[in-house]
Amino acid sequence: MKLAYWMYAGPAHIGTLRVASSFKNVHAIMHAPLGDDYFNVMRSMLERERDFTPVTASIVDRHVLARGSQNKVVENITRKDKEERPDLIVLTPTCTSSILQEDLQNFVDRASMDSESDVILADVNHYRVNELQAADRTLEQVVRFYIEKSKKQGDLNLTKTEKPSANILGIFTLGFHNQHDCRELKRLLQELGIEINEVIPEGGSVNNLKNLPRAWFNLVPYREVGLMTAIYLEKEFGMPYVSTTPMGVVDTATCIREIEKILNSFDKDVVVDFESYIDKQTRFVSQAAWFSRSIDCQNLTGKKAVVFGDATHAASMTKILAREMGINVACAGTYCKHDADWFKEQVQGYCDEVLITDDHTEVGDLIARIEPSAIFGTQMERHIGKRLNIPCGVISAPVHIQNFPLGYRPFLGYEGTNQIADLVYNSFTLGMEDHLLEIFGGHDTKEVITKSLSTEEGLTWTSDAQAELSKIPGFVRGKIKRNTEKFARENNISEINIEVMYAAKESLNA
């Protein structure tokens, strides 16, 4: 446990609540002290939905600590069962309430006797896993619970659908452009003649989970959530799954070819061939392929970028920049430390260095050291970019409200390639704006601000030196300022004047 004002992946209970609140008619009860119950506010603020967040906090207060939690938790479960009539109630502790070491499974068993809803305890170790791992585990637990329940009741339908069909696993609330990606994936599959069997957990009903085995295969667009469920369904029913993220022209084609291979393994008499579809989409529907050969994109060739995000988006973005756009990825990184080996394997050969960390200060220092032309990362990298005056395109959760757009903005499939091409190009070209404004005027040019992440104490700039610095074009000013301050520190100079600036310049050129 560590104190931090920014976390890339939140605590485990947030992952459980994201999965539970994605399903229809599922209620989550969080056994937590005040302060851990911010999920409702966060989801209500960010997700553009009309429904209330179906999460209730069963608060651990001094009365609970004195008497024990059982009565309060059981009472909350049975009360919500009567009020909401949900299909399922999920009870989850938080890392704080886990310290109490209570037998919550016993509370669940007790509440189940008086509830018409199914009641389960989220089977997650709150000290060992983060938000994404917990979400993956909770989704698999819910699926397993209802598959086992259907087996006992004898109504599990294992007959495959007449036409090829797929389940999409892992689309859920607060995900990065998940709703838009889901629409694009549905469109893609329908154009390939594949029906959608179930989409879980977003908008899905737990009563339909028994129909999951009817699909011909499972599609897992994001590694972070859905993979455990796909592996369970493969082990239990021999269902194949595709886990290649269809992001970018190359990987979308790879994903479609994997689907083609699965469909052809089912019916030897009817052979499907999606090559003509891939060719048509790549050449005429996706604008990204011809854009990457245009003079606009060639201007970006060799430009330096830093990529950081969850494993899925950061790996895909790195490959798109390096392989499809000719951009030099100086560093690719992820905060998914549990998936470090897969990530390193994916980005091998596409970047100069790899960073695996969940500490935002490490990422900030690396960006300040590399000084890329653009950053592609999370909301935190956007903040870092603003402080360093480096443009940033947001490509991964965690994100703020501006990355829950009302318009259609998928990142997957062929329409996603267009969105990514726009994002990349706009991230780079807007960097010239300050420079052009300074040359042609029209705005008050802003004061020279410190562009370093850690403020340099004990260094003062004379007014002459500041005036000289303001004459330098904006897009290199930050670099020159940092180099001059570094030179001054190394030579124990506390006041920076014009002579020091020129001496620093000469020392770099030497």
UniProtKB/Swiss-Prot annotation:
Uppermost EC category: oxidoreductase
Pfam families noted in UniProt: Oxidored_nitro (PF00148), PCP_red (PF08369)
Subcellular location: Plastid, Chloroplast
Pathway listed: Porphyrin-containing compound metabolism; chlorophyll biosynthesis (light-independent)
Cofactor binding note: Binds 1 [4Fe-4S] cluster per heterodimer. The cluster is bound at the heterodimer interface by residues from both subunits.
Residue intervals passing through the bilayer: none
Required cofactor names: [4Fe-4S] cluster
Keywords of the record: 4Fe-4S, ATP-binding, Chlorophyll biosynthesis, Chloroplast, Iron, Iron-sulfur, Metal-binding, Nucleotide-binding, Oxidoreductase, Photosynthesis, Plastid
InterPro entries with a match to the protein in the record: ChlB/BchB/BchZ, LI-POR_suB-like_C, Nase/OxRdtase_comp1, P-CP_red_C, Protochl_reductB, Protochlorophyllide_Rdtase
Active-site residues, record numbering mapped to chain: D296
Binding residue positions for [4Fe-4S] cluster: D36
Catalytic activity: chlorophyllide a + oxidized 2[4Fe-4S]-[ferredoxin] + 2 ADP + 2 phosphate = protochlorophyllide a + reduced 2[4Fe-4S]-[ferredoxin] + 2 ATP + 2 H2O
Record-level GO BP terms: light-independent chlorophyll biosynthetic process; photosynthesis, dark reaction
Highest taxon above the source species: Eukaryota
Subunit structure: Protochlorophyllide reductase is composed of three subunits; ChlL, ChlN and ChlB. Forms a heterotetramer of two ChlB and two ChlN subunits.
Protein name, UniProt field: Light-independent protochlorophyllide reductase subunit B
Provenance organism: Chlorokybus atmophyticus
Gene giving rise to this polypeptide: chlB
